[in-house]
Amino acid sequence: EIYGDKLTLYINGYIKNLHDSEDLLIEVFAYLISKRPNIKSSFESYIYKAARNHALMFLRKAKRHIILTEEEMNFCIENTFEDEVCIAERNKRIYDCMEYLPSAQKEALYLVYIEGMSYKEAAAVLRKSAKQIDKLLQLGKKKLRPLLETEGIKSAFND
């Protein structure tokens, strides 16, 4: 429950199919239950790393198949209905703009700004150093700002 929706959206960022993302999430949890790995980092970092690996394995297997449908991601928070609609639309536009970034930058931005992970946690998930995460975020934000401005979004980052 705690990680379900977030991990489903994270996996969906890779495979672009919400139904398959939910199936992969179940596989990730089944893996964790059956293998009971010795987790040396934080559990959250480990589970995101496992989700990423399962998504990449899925994509390697799916290269022979054509994915016909793509689900849209919506990020909603509890607020008034009108605010939820505005926030969801804004977040969708941000996510759509992120699709134009290199995958490492997109993943770093997603983990730090959308999932709220620390640089260290994101570094563990992406198998990079915290300094590399910082650089990916800087480059990603630099490339993303002009795209967001064309969408009418002035400030997407809290810095």
Task: Identify the residue ranges that each predicted region occupies.
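C-terminal edge and immediately downstream basic/flexible tail or linker adjoining helix-turn-helix-like DNA-binding
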Residues: A124, K141-D159
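Sigma70-family region 2
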Residues: I26-S42, K61-K63
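Helix-turn-helix DNA-binding motif, specifically the short coil turn and the N-cap/start of the second
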Residues: N17, S118, R127-Q132
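Residues within the DNA-recognition helix of helix-turn-helix
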Residues: Y3, L136-L139, K143
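A short, charge-rich alpha-helical start-of-domain segment used by transcription regulators
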Residues: E1-L9, G13, H19
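A short pre-motif secondary-structure segment
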Residues: A108-V112
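Arg/Lys-rich amphipathic alpha helix in sigma70-family domain 2
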Residues: N38, K49-T69, I87
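Acidic, proline/glycine-rich intrinsically disordered inter-domain spacer in sigma factors
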Residues: M73-E99
